[in-house]
Amino acid sequence: MSAHSTAVGTAKRRTFAIISHPDAGKTTITEKLLLFGNAIQVGGSVKGKKGPHAKSDWMSMEQERGISVTSSVMQFPYKERTVNLLDTPGHEDFSEDTYRTLTAVDSVLMVIDGAKGVEDRTIKLMEVCRLRDTPILSFINKMDRDIRDPIDVMDEIETVLNIEAAPINWPIGMGKEFKGVYNLYTDIIHVFHHGQGSRIPDDTQIKGLNSPEADALLGAYAADIRDEIELVKGATHKFDLDAYLAGKLTPVFFGTALGNFGVREMLDGFVEWAPPPLDREANTRVVSAVEDKFSGFVFKIQANMDPKHRDRIAFMRVCSGTYTRGMKMRHVRLGKDVKISDAVTFLAGDRSQVEEAISGDIIGLHNHGTIQIGDTFTEGEDLKFTGIPHFAPELFRRIRLKDPLKVKQLQKGLQQLSEEGSTQVFFPLRNNDIIVGAVGVLQFEVVAYRLKDEYKVEAIYEPVSVATARWVDCEDDKKMAEFKRKCEDNLAIDGGGHLTYLAPTRVNLSLSQERYPDVLFRSTREH
């Protein structure tokens, strides 16, 4: 691919992830987006449930439970753009993978349940988006159900998530009375039709809120709806592209993913406004997305995507240049040149060989244990991309073996699972315990399942009095030595060899931070 055509292709890429609370409709909206992109023919192919079309559940545990534990990648064309959608676990439980996936995208679609408003999972994910000022576009879902007053939901987005919200369209009615949406910028009503959820729906438009056709649709409510829309125009933020791109304002669309309504308008806005692949910070310089030379970083490793092959796949975000099949690239951390001839791309589980990938694309590399999260690959330059963090776990368990003779297998399994990012493992300085940390409860189940399935180790969990963890660091060696001596009971080494403070309570953490002001307590750590 010539440098010019790479630059043109890069400008047309849109790489994003969807964030939402469980049950807000993320799986449904993913399915509708793929329908518009002609990536799947039948509405219903991405179900996170045990439907016959299930496309995005790989691990056998996922298939048993009917949830998507791991994030997959889907690419589809839309309006002369190439859209890369990174799916993130939407189950009641999620993991660090969800957080890290957000470091590999250029923008985010936030799906909010119109009946429930902003929920705690969304708040956590927004905090991660804040680390990089990621642009956020919002879709308020389930307008065909009885929902809260849209003004209240908008207000909640602004106050709870601390971001300005600019409605692009406004719902006309809700629940059984839902008639459609009115675009505040084009003066067009898009009319809602029932029963078109599993295909690309008809787009019936009425031009002009004050037209006779609008009167016929709105009936007795016409005057009230016009008043409400006037009020909304006066009381809400106007859409500002620069503020959106800076992560300070979110354009808001209303619709129903299940009814496949409002999704098209949102997707139109998304491909128009969302940024193409952005430049990325590395340790020595900023890498431009349109540079000729290839570079990329690994943000996620997934095991056993194919039970027949017991392999692990490293997901890599291409940051510059072009990957071509059979090319040589430098694995910077190991200082080794490797030939990559079998990278894969996915439509959730359907693997296909990649001939070529450019900035913004996600490719999968076969990994036999040498690739770790955060690894950078280049065409020879020694640089390392930054901003791919470990997040401090929020839940902890002590892990114990049923068969004490299998300590070696347990340590090997935990080491590999922690390199992969499935869990974090801590070895306290004062005893021989092994403590496992996670962001969500399901991660513990996944670890126990995989230890048994892949390493033939049966392990059980016990409660442990750890409330949170912080990576610790101090420039003054003397003060660090004193801290280590006095706090040894609470110190551990993590899977990467880093000193970690395991706080029994939040209060204990605050007191320790006050007592040792020269020691840095970090809640994230670079890979």
UniProtKB/Swiss-Prot annotation:
Keywords from the UniProt entry: Cytoplasm, GTP-binding, Nucleotide-binding, Protein biosynthesis
Query: What are the record's GO terms for cellular component?
Result: cytosol
Q: Which residues are the signal sequence here? A: none
Q: Which GO terms describe its biological process?
A: regulation of translational termination
Molecular function terms, GO-annotated: GTP binding; GTPase activity; guanosine tetraphosphate binding; translation release factor activity, codon nonspecific; translation release factor activity, codon specific
By its UniProt entry, which CDD domains does this protein fall under?
A: RF3 (cd04169), RF3_II (cd03689), RF3_III (cd16259)
Q: Where is the tr-type G domain?
A: 11-278
Q: Where in the cell is it found?
A: Cytoplasm
Positions contributing to GTP binding: 20-27, 87-91, 141-144
What family does the database annotate?
A: Belongs to the TRAFAC class translation factor GTPase superfamily. Classic translation factor GTPase family. PrfC subfamily.
Describe the function of this protein.
Increases the formation of ribosomal termination complexes and stimulates activities of RF-1 and RF-2. It binds guanine nucleotides and has strong preference for UGA stop codons. It may interact directly with the ribosome. The stimulation of RF-1 and RF-2 is significantly reduced by GTP and GDP, but not by GMP.
Protein name per the record: Peptide chain release factor 3
Q: From which source organism is this entry? A: Saccharophagus degradans (strain 2-40 / ATCC 43961 / DSM 17024)
